[in-house]
């Protein structure tokens, strides 16, 4: 075949793309472009036609030129020549033209005709009217109920469409088009049509007189600015394929829009060979046609053609010759996406700026999978690319997913630079932006949670006893110890004096699986209480308070309310108040209908009544056994394994049941509570020890109360072995020793008493089952005589013939006692590292003991504060990444921050760790984090529970619950609601990121967007992965807030946890007061902006779900503001709002400017960081603070340190720069004859490193006015005083000599004078009575390390600038 010659008419980016694709055809040898462009001329097969050879308006001349030059095909890019009839003239000359006839082009050039055509041929479109009379058009508008779009009927370069917001705008548009003739003759007729709602998609197809071959759908972006704001343009970018249109909808467009159009044109004898472009709106009623275009779209063409896996010339010829029917469905690159971002010149679309030099085009063109198409470029006499139009060029990127392609294309625009360039950073966002996510859609139902709280409050209230203060729903449960009395050994009512608090935590293990299978939940709560209360009892303590933790996949309010009712029943039986709890809905960790429970009990006893009295236990003491009610709550993994292996069903009638109950109902018999019969018995002082027979059975639990040299000998003949145990032994072939090590075997509690004491006989069903003996050297501490024989006899009853079953052990069922013991050994050092005064004993006993009188604070009227929480689905990230060392900090922070909100000092902490298979290393890492959290909050890790529950958790999954106890004086308890008043200030404490709430929503977002935890987080300040950023631990506020609590001026604290700012602040307010916050004073972390953008999360939903940058708020009187802030120096806390009256029916939280500030942070995500240079002369402590801040995502610095310059060699500041991999240099002022010469050298070096902002961090040189003026508004300095006080180098000394009670530091813009520039930020530092210059200086340094990063952030982000009057101006 002879090589084909083509003529391409047009000069823009669309034509560049067409030429680029056509030259890839093996059939094409030459492409003539007219008028073309220099960009198009760079293509190998292209040559430009000289303007002297042709006139674009002279179609006969063009046809003649084609004949002379043997042109095989003419491709017409723009619509104007088609509308004027170029195709007709060429076809008349027997020249193939890819483009419709003049009559066919009318489908675009005459919108009134086009709308009528759609109606005639039943093409789905909007209702409309066409007018030449403005009055009639406006009358139609005023009488139409729908929102409207006003269009100039003719060609208006893509700008003649006005989407009216209201009737007035629509009428004004009519006046502009018909009255002012804004679009010339294109506006002789105006079309007014119904405004359709939905996503707009471009669908193009090759067509001839019969057939359609569809191209992949694309989406154009018409508005100038991000988020579809700004003026209408010809198109600022596009992407393809567009996933917003379904295959079903695309089929409708092909058949009911494009094919009907082709059929209609044929029926009306209109020639149409070319591209038919349909602008489609995806409405609720299906796809509707907005408009037709008669040519390739711009910029859609530029992103569709790189995906086309066909010969474009062949397709065009098939269209021109009516042979499309012979072309199979088109092929495109598989799993490839294309995104194009248009770069426009300054002033576009109203004007264009020409002649600006463009750099970076060649750099982008050399990148893999990048293409640059020129729309409006030229070259100057230096052979440099320059701007030559409104839309200058389009950067195309191809990638295997749309987000990546969009990111690459946008970053390419950062490489290509020219003065005044405009481009959008959100091209393609609509495709991967999911619908507006809510917390409820992620599986967490806040309303259900609130409903549950309402239902269980009465249950909780029914358990209250003396000492209880407040009710469920606050930040902790409160008990007033002075109100708790007991009957002493003399029978007198007495207050506790030397108080020891005994705390225990436990769960109910895989007994939950039985409850789940049977769907019977009313007694499992009793088990939970019994497991904790009985342990506390073993230390001689009276149980007084209880907390529960309930985790589930889906909160079914009736089920959880039933569980809590059981908990309340247990608490009433134990005279132990249910004063709080946590219900954690975690859809990505638990399946629907799946639950886990953990409980915590605190008891109270006198120091000299603590049990066990190990030193008082002697040979001959008697062992009393209290019968169990059945299996209780241990060993159920073995029970479940036996059922799994034998095939019995829980719903079958149990062979061992005397009351014909099913196996499930027998197994669900609740654990026996021993408080009521045992507690009075403890008061006589004869009891030496108690042992609760739980996990580990008789063999493991009794030794916990014995000295090493003694043992217990008990006789199985002294009590009746319940049938359930022999049945289990028989069907699981479990040996006697395994039974004794796994189950209670009928004895739920052991009491050790003196030999001659017979008071135990008053306890119902109590049995003397043995005595204390001398232990054989290294022999067992528990000897159970006759048990093997008793068990064998009972087992025989259940055996069927000679059938033997496989022997099953507890380890076989998935529970490894050895691993559990290894873990205890591993974590003991971690727990010990947290010890503080008051701790008694260590890990491994039945409860954790704490002596209040030794804690370091003397309490007159102590209040106990109890709190519980978990870490939620943040755990899932840790588990997927195998990073377990920080979630323990989260656990402690979530609990101890709540304790703090009551004005209390956290003292002790207990953890609950539940897993499917115990990995000792993982659990050790988790507990090491818990210990670190305890150290950060000065609380002690007093104990915990590790529950290995095969079948309830997958092997690599675990859940955590924490229980914290704090103490405060009664008069210091917060919130002081009665003291709150209008005008009080609200102080905000910055968060450390997301903390530990809202992660179910984050998981849902990741599920929908396809992000991975190992991907680099776009919002990260230091290139960390999503996983690393989201695992940043929750901030512990104890140490920074404690000094403020000691002032006595704090009225309330609110921990911003689940429910966000919206729901947590009202928890500390009376109904008549409202918190008014100012978002301009909150440093909103970039992570929240990223979540908002990518999850399309409504701003109110953000406030209801996340902390949004504030992890704790404090309320105090305005008059005490200075004292409070002085006590908080070094904490980054600041005033963010005030208390105002509540409006009728108003919410109790108002966040002013929230949407505006959030959107600003969202925009900052896509803006390159400001490049910062730091000038130093010394150790560089402020440099280090700036380095640390710019590497912290949560600081949101919008800047990076790219260069450090020193005027002195060998200083420590340079080492800091080197360690941070920041380039540095030394320019000594001694090497220059004048200050001016030195400053010129500084300036040149800073420019060389593209520095945009300079920070003077201890730079001991006075800069010249010339240098300062060059960097005006970009030069920051820090000074160690509250300017304008005490300028110069003796500021600290001056402050002390003046007798001031506060000093501080100031960050300011630098001007020509010393320390006189406009102030940006100040931090207050208190001056103490015995302060010296050195001590004050040291404290000011701490404040500087907060103030300088804060000021840099404000300037780099554009929140603060220096105006023309040299004053600080806030955005």
UniProtKB/Swiss-Prot annotation:
Keyword Metal-binding appears in the UniProt entry: yes
Pfam family, one: GARS_C
Active site, renumbered: 1279 (proton donor)
Site (Raises pKa of active site His): 1315
Record-listed (6R)-10-formyltetrahydrofolate binding positions: 1235, 1260-1263, 1277, 1311-1315
Binding residues annotated for Mg(2+), in chain numbering: 291, 293
PROSITE patterns: ATP_GRASP, GARS, GART
Ranges for region GART domain: 1169-1369
Residues annotated for N(1)-(5-phospho-beta-D-ribosyl)glycinamide binding in this entry: 1180-1182, 1341-1344
Single GO MF descriptor: phosphoribosylglycinamide formyltransferase activity
Cofactor binding note: Binds 1 magnesium or manganese ion per subunit.
Keyword Manganese assigned: yes
Annotated ATP-grasp domain residues: 115-321
Catalytic activity annotation: 5-phospho-beta-D-ribosylamine + glycine + ATP = N(1)-(5-phospho-beta-D-ribosyl)glycinamide + ADP + phosphate + H(+); 2-formamido-N(1)-(5-O-phospho-beta-D-ribosyl)acetamidine + ATP = 5-amino-1-(5-phospho-beta-D-ribosyl)imidazole + ADP + phosphate + H(+); N(1)-(5-phospho-beta-D-ribosyl)glycinamide + (6R)-10-formyltetrahydrofolate = N(2)-formyl-N(1)-(5-phospho-beta-D-ribosyl)glycinamide + (6S)-5,6,7,8-tetrahydrofolate + H(+)
Enzyme Commission number, as recorded: 6.3.4.13, 6.3.3.1, 2.1.2.2
InterPro entries in the record: ATP-grasp, ATP_grasp_subdomain_1, Formyl_transf_N, Formyl_transf_N_sf, GART, GART_AS, PreATP-grasp_dom_sf, PRibGlycinamid_synth_ATP-grasp
A GO CC term assigned to this protein in UniProt: cytosol
Record keywords, A-Z: ATP-binding, Ligase, Magnesium, Manganese, Metal-binding, Multifunctional enzyme, Nucleotide-binding, Purine biosynthesis, Transferase
One GO term (biological process): adenine biosynthetic process
Domain observations: The N-terminal ATP-grasp domain carries the phosphoribosylamine--glycine ligase activity. The central AIRS domain carries the phosphoribosylformylglycinamidine cyclo-ligase activity.
Subunit structure as annotated in this protein's UniProt entry: Homodimer.
Name of the protein in its database record: Trifunctional purine biosynthetic protein adenosine-3
């Amino acid at each position: 075949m002879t090589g084909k010659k083509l003529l391409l008419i047009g000069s823009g980016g669309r034509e560049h793309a067409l030429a680029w694709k056509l030259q890839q055809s093996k059939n094409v040898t030459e492409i003539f472009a007219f008028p073309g462009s220099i960009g198009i001329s760079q293509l190998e097969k292209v040559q430009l036609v000289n303007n002297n050879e042709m006139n674009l308006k002279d179609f006969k001349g063009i046809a003649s030129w084609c004949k002379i030059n043997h042109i095989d095909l003419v491709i017409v890019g723009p619509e104007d020549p088609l509308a004027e009839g170029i195709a007709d003239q060429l076809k008349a000359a027997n020249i193939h033209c890819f483009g419709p006839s003049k009559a066919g082009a009318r489908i675009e050039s005459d919108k009134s005709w086009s709308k009528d055509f759609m109606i005639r041929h039943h093409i789905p479109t909007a209702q409309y009217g066409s007018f030449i009379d403005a009055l009639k058009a406006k009358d139609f508008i005023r009488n139409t109920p729908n929102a409207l779009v006003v269009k100039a009927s003719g060609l208006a370069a893509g700008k003649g469409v006005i989407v009216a917001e209201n009737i007035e705008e629509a009428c004004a548009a009519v006046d502009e088009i018909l009255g002012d003739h804004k679009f010339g003759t294109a506006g002789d007729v105006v079309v007014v049509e119904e405004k359709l709602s939905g996503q707009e998609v471009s669908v193009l197809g090759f067509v001839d007189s019969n057939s359609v071959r569809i191209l992949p759908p694309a989406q154009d972006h018409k508005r100038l600015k991000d988020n579809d704001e700004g003026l209408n343009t010809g198109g600022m970018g596009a992407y393809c394929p567009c996933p917003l249109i379904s295959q079903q909808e695309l089929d409708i467009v092909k058949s009911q829009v494009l094919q009907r159009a082709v059929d209609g044109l044929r029926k009306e004898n209109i020639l149409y060979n070319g591209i038919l472009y349909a602008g489609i709106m995806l409405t609720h009623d299906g796809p509707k046609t907005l408009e037709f275009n008669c040519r390739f779209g711009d910029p859609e063409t530029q992103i569709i053609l790189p995906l086309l896996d066909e010969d474009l010339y062949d397709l065009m010829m098939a269209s021109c010759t009516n042979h499309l029917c012979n072309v199979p469905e088109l092929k495109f690159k598989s799993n490839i996406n294309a995104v194009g971002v248009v770069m426009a010149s300054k002033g576009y679309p109203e004007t264009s700026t020409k002649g600006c030099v463009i750099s970076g085009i060649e750099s982008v063109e050399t990148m893999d999978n990048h293409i640059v198409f020129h729309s409006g470029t030229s070259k100057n006499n230096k052979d440099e690319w320059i701007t030559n139009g409104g839309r200058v060029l389009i950067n195309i990127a191809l990638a295997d997913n749309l987000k990546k392609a969009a990111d690459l294309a946008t970053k390419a625009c950062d490489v290509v630079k020219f003065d005044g360039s405009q481009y959008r950073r959100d091209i393609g966002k609509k495709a991967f932006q999911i619908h507006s996510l809510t917390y409820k859609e992620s599986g967490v139902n806040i309303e259900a949670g609130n409903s549950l709280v309402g239902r269980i409050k009465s249950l909780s209230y029914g358990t209250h006893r003396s000492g209880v203060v407040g009710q469920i729903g606050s930040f902790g449960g409160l008990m007033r110890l002075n109100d708790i009395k007991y009957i002493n050994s003399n029978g007198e009512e007495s207050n506790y004096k030397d108080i020891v608090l005994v705390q225990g935590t436990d769960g109910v293990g895989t007994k939950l699986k039985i409850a789940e299978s049977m769907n019977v939940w009313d007694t499992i709560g009793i088990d939970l209480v019994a497991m904790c209360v009985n342990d506390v009892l073993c230390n001689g303590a009276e149980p007084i308070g209880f907390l529960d933790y309930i985790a589930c996949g889906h909160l079914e309010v009736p089920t959880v309310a039933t569980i809590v009712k059981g908990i309340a029943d247990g608490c009433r039986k134990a005279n132990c108040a249910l004063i709080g709890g946590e219900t954690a809905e975690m859809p990505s960790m638990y399946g629907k209908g799946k639950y886990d429970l953990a409980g915590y009990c605190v008891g109270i006893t006198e120091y000299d009544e603590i049990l066990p009295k190990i030193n008082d236990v002697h040979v001959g003491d008697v062992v009393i056994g209290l019968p169990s009610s059945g299996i209780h709550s241990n060993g159920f993994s073995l029970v479940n394994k036996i059922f799994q292996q034998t095939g019995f069903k829980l719903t079958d009638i149990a062979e061992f049941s005397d009351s014909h109950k099913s196996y499930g109902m027998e197994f669900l018999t609740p654990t026996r509570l021993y408080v009521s019969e045992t507690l009075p018995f403890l008061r006589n002082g004869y009891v030496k020890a108690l042992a609760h027979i739980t996990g580990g059975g008789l063999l493991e639990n009794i030794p916990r109360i014995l000295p090493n040299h003694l043992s217990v000998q008990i006789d199985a003949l002294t009590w009746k072995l319940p049938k359930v145990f022999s049945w289990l032994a028989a069907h699981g072939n479990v040996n006697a020793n395994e039974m004794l090590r796994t189950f209670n075997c009928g004895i739920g509690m052991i009491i050790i008493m003196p030999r001659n004491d017979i008071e135990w006989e008053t306890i119902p069903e109590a049995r003397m089952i043995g005595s204390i003996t001398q232990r054989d050297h290294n022999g067992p501490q528990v000897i159970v005589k006759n048990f093997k024989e008793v068990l064998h006899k009972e087992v025989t009853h259940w055996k069927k013939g000679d059938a033997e079953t496989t022997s099953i052990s507890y380890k076989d069922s998935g529970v490894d006692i050895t691993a559990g013991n290894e873990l205890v050994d591993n974590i003991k050092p971690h727990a010990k590292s947290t010890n503080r005064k008051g701790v008694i004993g260590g890990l491994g006993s039945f409860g954790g003991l704490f002596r209040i009188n030794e804690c370091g604070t003397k309490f007159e009227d102590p209040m106990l504060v109890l709190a519980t929480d978990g870490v939620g689905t943040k755990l899932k990230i840790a588990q997927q990444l195998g990073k377990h060392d920080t979630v323990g900090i989260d656990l402690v922070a979530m609990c101890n921050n709540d304790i703090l909100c009551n004005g209390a000092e956290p003292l002790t902490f207990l953890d609950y760790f539940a897993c499917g298979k115990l990995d000792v290393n993982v659990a050790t890492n988790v507990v090491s984090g818990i210990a670190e959290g305890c150290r950060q909050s000065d609380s002690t890790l007093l104990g915990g529970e590790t529950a290995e529950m095969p079948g309830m958790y997958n092997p690599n999954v675990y859940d955590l619950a924490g229980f914290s106890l704090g103490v405060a004086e009664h008069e210091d308890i917060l919130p002081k609601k009665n003291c709150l008043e209008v005008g009080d200030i609200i102080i905000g404490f910055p968060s450390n990121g997301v903390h530990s709430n809202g992660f179910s929503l984050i998981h849902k977002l990741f599920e929908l967007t396809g992000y991975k935890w190992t991907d680099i987080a776009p919002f990260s300040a230091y290139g960390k992965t999503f996983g690393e950023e989201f695992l940043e631990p929750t901030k512990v506020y104890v140490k920074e807030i404690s000094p403020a609590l000691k002032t006595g001026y704090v009225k309330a604290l609110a921990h911003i946890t689940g429910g966000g700012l919206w729901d947590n602040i009202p928890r500390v307010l009376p109904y008549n007061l409202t918190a008014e916050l100012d978002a301009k004073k909150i440093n909103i972390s970039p992570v929240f902006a990223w979540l908002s953008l990518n999850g399309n999360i409504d701003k109110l939903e953000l406030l209801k779900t996340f902390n949004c940058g504030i992890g704790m708020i404090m309320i105090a009187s305005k008059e005490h503001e200075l004292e409070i802030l002085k006590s908080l120096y070094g904490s980054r806390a600041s005033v963010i709002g005030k208390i105002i009256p509540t409006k009728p029916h108003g919410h109790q939280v108002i966040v002013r400017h929230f949407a505006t500030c959030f959107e600003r942070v969202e925009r900052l995500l896509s803006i390159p960081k400001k490049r910062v240079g730091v000038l130093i002369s010394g150790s560089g402590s402020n440099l280090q603070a700036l380095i640390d801040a710019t590497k912290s995502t949560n600081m949101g610095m919008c800047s990076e340190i790219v260069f450090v310059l020193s005027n002195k060699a060998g200083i420590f500041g340079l080492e800091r720069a080197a360690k941070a991999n920041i380039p540095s240099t030394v320019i000594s002022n001694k090497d220059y004859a004048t200050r001016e010469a030195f400053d010129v050298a500084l300036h040149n070096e800073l420019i060389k490193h593209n520095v945009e902002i300079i920070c003077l961090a201890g730079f001991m040189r006075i800069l010249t006015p010339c240098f300062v003026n060059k960097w005006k508004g970009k030069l920051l300095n820090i000074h160690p005083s509250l300017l304008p006080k005490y300028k110069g180098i003796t500021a600290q000394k001056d402050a002390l000599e003046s007798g001031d009670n506060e000093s501080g530091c100031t960050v300011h813009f630098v001007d020509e004078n010393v320390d006189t520039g406009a102030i940006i930020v100040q931090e207050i530092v208190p001056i103490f009575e015995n302060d010296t210059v050195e001590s004050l200086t040291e404290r000011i340094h701490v404040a500087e390390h907060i103030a300088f990063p804060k000021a840099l952030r404000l300037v780099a982000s554009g929140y603060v600038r220096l105006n023309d009057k040299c004053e600080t101006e806030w955005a």
